[in-house]
């Protein structure tokens, strides 16, 4: 089945900005996260698709390659790879090294290929508080670890491990036809360069077995959804004692019930009473460090923004903290008593008349506009 266009997966058009890509990824990853759609295979596949798209479009170099060549840029070792299928693949450096080595003196001659293990991915969901302040999380991964029975050699204890007679230990078979030389993986030893007399029964000669492994991951302060933490050597081990790949921990920050995050800034809505909005006063607003007092000037309207500097998220690069931006929402009183309603009626009456433009300029302007509209409408009918 043909792969979907990565831009379409994220609901974007080609040429979308870096921020657009990040916002789309955060929104879709949160919507289709397996924890929110337990048991849904469709959501799980969609989540993988979204992450694969962001893995490419969220990286400038990979995105440039994708824009030019499409999915072909990442097939057969084209560069992007994928978490689910491993980050490995053919290495262009090795490929060209073999070609030019053959032409200019056989640089790759007799060299044994050591193929390291696959890179792994782990999706980790954390709270906003943990993302802002940093934390340590214990995780469990499914991986390929060294076989305890054979110590990773792939051979039964006491069994001989000899040099492969077909490739003489290089792990590669070379064939020459006229001026052309081709090289391929040795079919006898599968590239290991060794022949095992009796393969280990526990790992069937691979030198590695499936295991669950517990790890402790340190999350630095300031991480955001889509950030990746690389744990070198914590991926799957390679066959027959080859080194391990890396583990990539991909961060997903859970939605917060009060704050919204945009980069290093935090946003929240702060409701205030009708009286405080009109007369002014002092209120308490929440921050991730605790409650902070905020002075509200008289005649504050809904939508007014107050910036609290340094109360946002510290950048992982610069270390400087962003701001907390509070948006005021004037709350209309409800469940009023008869006495309270009477007081509001009196207030309304006192604000009407000639002084309306002074006390309620927007209402006055709106009413004047409505009057002019109907006056003009009446003239056009005549």
UniProtKB/Swiss-Prot annotation:
Gene3D superfamilies: DnaJ domain (1.10.287.110), Heat shock protein DnaJ, cysteine-rich domain (2.10.230.10), Urease metallochaperone UreE, N-terminal domain (2.60.260.20). SUPFAM superfamilies: Chaperone J-domain (SSF46565), DnaJ/Hsp40 cysteine-rich domain (SSF57938), HSP40/DnaJ peptide-binding domain (SSF49493). Its cofactor is Zn(2+). GO terms for molecular function: ATP binding; heat shock protein binding; unfolded protein binding; zinc ion binding. Disulfide bonds: none annotated. HAMAP family: DnaJ (MF_01152). Zn(2+) 1 binds at residues 147, 150, 200, 203. Homodimer. InterPro entries: DnaJ (IPR012724), DnaJ_C (IPR002939), DnaJ_domain (IPR001623), DnaJ_domain_CS (IPR018253), HSP40/DnaJ_pept-bd (IPR008971), HSP_DnaJ_Cys-rich_dom (IPR001305), HSP_DnaJ_Cys-rich_dom_sf (IPR036410), J_dom_sf (IPR036869). It is found in: Cytoplasm. Residues 5-70 form the J domain. Its main location: cytoplasm. A zinc finger (CR-type) spans 134-212. This is Chaperone protein DnaJ. Pfam families: DnaJ, DnaJ_C, DnaJ_CXXCXGXG. GO terms for biological process: chaperone cofactor-dependent protein refolding; DNA replication; protein refolding; response to heat. Binds 2 Zn(2+) ions per monomer. It comes from Haemophilus influenzae (strain PittGG).
């Amino acid at each position: 089945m043909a792969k979907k266009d990565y831009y379409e997966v994220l609901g974007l058009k080609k040429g979308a900005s870096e921020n657009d890509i990040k916002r789309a990824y955060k929104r879709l990853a949160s919507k289709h996260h397996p924890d929110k759609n337990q048991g849904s295979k469709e959501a799980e596949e969609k989540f993988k698709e979204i992450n694969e798209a962001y893995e490419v479009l969220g990286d400038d170099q990979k995105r440039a390659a994708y824009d030019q060549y499409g999915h072909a840029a990442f097939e057969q070792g084209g560069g992007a790879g994928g978490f689910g299928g491993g980050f490995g693949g053919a290495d262009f450096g090795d490929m060209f090294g073999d070609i030019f080595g053959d032409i200019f003196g056989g640089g790759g001659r007799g060299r044994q290929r050591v193929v390291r293990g696959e890179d792994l991915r782990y999706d980790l969901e954390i709270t906003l508080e943990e993302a802002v302040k940093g934390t340590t999380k214990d995780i469990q991964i499914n991986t390929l670890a060294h076989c305890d029975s054979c110590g990773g050699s792939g051979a039964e204890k006491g069994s001989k491990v000899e040099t492969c007679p077909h490739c003489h230990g290089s792990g590669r078979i070379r064939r020459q036809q006229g001026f052309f030389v081709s090289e391929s993986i040795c079919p006898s030893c599968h590239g290991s360069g060794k022949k095992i007399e009796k393969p280990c029964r526990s790992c069937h000669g691979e030198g590695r077995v499936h295991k669950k492994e517990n790890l402790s991951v340190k999350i630095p302060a300031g991480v955001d959804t889509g950030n990746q933490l690389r744990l070198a050597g914590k991926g799957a081990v390679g066959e027959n004692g080859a080194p391990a790949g890396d583990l990539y921990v991909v961060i997903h920050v859970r939605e917060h019930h009060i704050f919204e995050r945009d980069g290093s800034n935090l946003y929240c809505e702060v409701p205030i009473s009708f009286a405080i909005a009109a007369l002014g006063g002092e209120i308490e607003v929440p921050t991730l460090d605790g409650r902070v007092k905020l002075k509200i000037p008289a005649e504050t309207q809904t939508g007014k923004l107050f910036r609290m500097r340094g109360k946002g998220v510290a950048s992982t690069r610069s270390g400087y903290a962003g701001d907390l931006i509070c948006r005021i929402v004037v709350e209309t009183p409800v469940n009023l008593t008869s006495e309270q309603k009477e007081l509001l009626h009196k207030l309304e009456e006192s604000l009407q008349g000639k002084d309306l433009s002074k006390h309620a300029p927007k209402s006055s302007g709106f009413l004047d506009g409505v009057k002019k509209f109907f006056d003009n409408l009446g003239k056009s009918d005549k």
